[in-house]
Amino acid sequence: MKTMTLRNWFAIIVALLCSTSALAYDFEIDGIYYNITSESEKTVGVCGEINGYYLYGRFNIPETIVYKNVTYSVTSIEERAFYKNNRLSYIAFPHSIKTIGDEAFYGCSNFYLTVLPEGLTNIGKSAFAACKKITSIEIPKNVTNIGERAFHSCTNLTSVKLSCDITSIPSQAFASCRYLRQINIPSTVKNIGKGVFYECMALASIELPDGITEIGDSAFYFTGLTTINMPNSITDIGSHAFYYCKLTSIDIPKSVKSIKNSTFASCFNLSSVILHEGLTDIGGRAFNYCRELESLKIPNSVTNIGEYAFAECSKLTEIEVPEKLEKIGPSAFWFCSKLTSIKIPANVTRIESETFYGCNGLTSIEIPANVTHIGSRAFCGCRGLTSIEIPNSVESIEGNVFRECLEVSSIKVDKNNKMYDSREDCNAIIDSKTNTLITGCMSTIIPNNTTSIGSDAFYHISKLTSINIPGSVTSIGATAFRGTRITSIEIPDNVTSIGFGAFWDCERLTSVKLPNNLSAIESYLFDFCTNLTSIVIPNSVTSIGEKSFAYCRNLNSIEIPEKVTSIGHSAFYLCTNLRQITCHATEPPVCEKQAFEQVDRLNCKLIVPEGSEEAYMAANEWRGFYTADGIEGFEDESIVDVYNLQGVTVKKQVRMKDLQGTLPKGIYIINGKKIAVR
């Protein structure tokens, strides 16, 4: 046996000392641990209980204890004293208790709190958080401080009586108390902190006292509030304060200068809002998704409306905007689909992106003479608009500003505008520097000096049935004619590029002439052109993009030039009537997966250069087509071998005239050639 050294003994003693101090108590009496909090005042605090010593989870804490012949008053429950003690069900507090520390009863899921001691002055942070058996609570009158999250997630708490004279209800004090139905707010309270009643879904009403000045961020977020009084003393309402409440009406006090972000967002039942003079700012998403709101008068004092402020207010038909308004944020009226008119004030210099996106009810809009910028999709989807006028002040127009404005028949740009024009009364907006047509309509006539047709220029203008593209045009942008009802199109040879999906969804398109200098068929170019029957791909083309002819169900034949080296994913997907493919490339173009998915290969003839049959038969995605040489291409006296596609011999050394009519329907290999029997 080895002899213990002095160093070994020292290590053991240190370990014992450390383990003792980790318990953090001074002494134990009757199974309860205590700390001496003041020797001079002879006070102690409860800091826990001996594991296994409890009496069915019930404790009677004495008012005084005697330790070493000294009498101490028990004045506090220390921090984390009973933290997550699931055995604890009841404690009788002595009147001497003044403080309950942070997380003292946190997570005591079986603890029934009955009465707090009258002498209590302080409740710590998260003191009773997640005590799921507490159903009601009365805060004694002497309490001057309640910590943050004090009763957070007391999910069965239904009523709270605040008898104390506190001035503030701290952050998340009652958050996630989902069954809380009743609580009084003392007249002394000036501030309701952040998230105090967050997710108190059963809380339907509350009375705020006169004198209250501040409602914190998310204070009533996702509560069941249907009504609430708003005293005139309130000066500040935080962001998300009433988010997702069931309020039907609100009168915001004159003392409030700013409505912050998402304050009343997703209040789906809110139908009446009263705003007063003195208000200067309506924040982003302030009334987003208030779907019952039909009309609103914004005070003259308001100078700013934030992004998405009234987005998805789908019943809003009328809104009175003040003359002093200087800024309207992006998407401010996004999908206010029943809004019929709005006057943009003269002080507004920018119309931001998506400001009026999806406002289907707008029939006219006047862009003020001071506006210098119109953001992307600002009026996209305003399907009731019939005319557009651009003032001379406009210096920049971003993409898709008037996309899907289906009823527009007149477009004019002020003649003094230096950046844009509508030359020759073309009923379009043209970028004067680049000669690019950026916005068209059903009545557009493309001028002869136009060099480009911009992306989405005629996007989903369903009343456009024909268009003439002049020889000056060299490029057509992505989805430029998507969703139009043109029936035929002739693209001049000067065009060298046609963008992604340029004729996507042109369901009435039956014929197309592509330019001879085109280098690629871009993805989705003729996707869903369901009435297209045939098309000649120019010899200059080297690639056919993804889904370029997908869903062209009436496409009967296609001719692929010899320079084509690649065919994209699902390029001819669901071309169910395709009966002939002529491919001039001696090497089979590389096809991505499903290039010919749902094409009836058994009934689709593949014509390839002589000598290339075997290469096509061996190539992915080309397998399964039958070649142009049918059985009738052989001499009657020819002796042939017949195999199925798996290489199994079907007939051996048989004369062709004896083979006629004997093979079941299918694809066979006869003397090295793939043959279809139908």
Which residue ranges define each predicted feature?
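Bacterial N-terminal signal peptides
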Residues: W9-T20
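C-terminal outer-membrane/trafficking sorting elements
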Residues: D629-R678
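Consensus positions within tandem repeat domains that build extended binding/scaffold surfaces
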Residues: E79-A81, G101-Y106, G124-A129, G147-A150, ...
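Boundary at the C-terminal end of the N-terminal hydrophobic targeting segment
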Residues: A22-D26
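Structural signature of tandem-repeat unit edges
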Residues: E39, Y54-S76, N86-T99, S109-N122, ...
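Positively charged n-region of N-terminal signal peptides that target proteins for export
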Residues: M1-N8, R678
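Short strand-coil-strand connectors
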Residues: D30, S432, G440, D505, ...
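A recurrent domain-boundary module in secreted/ectodomain proteins
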Residues: G611-G630
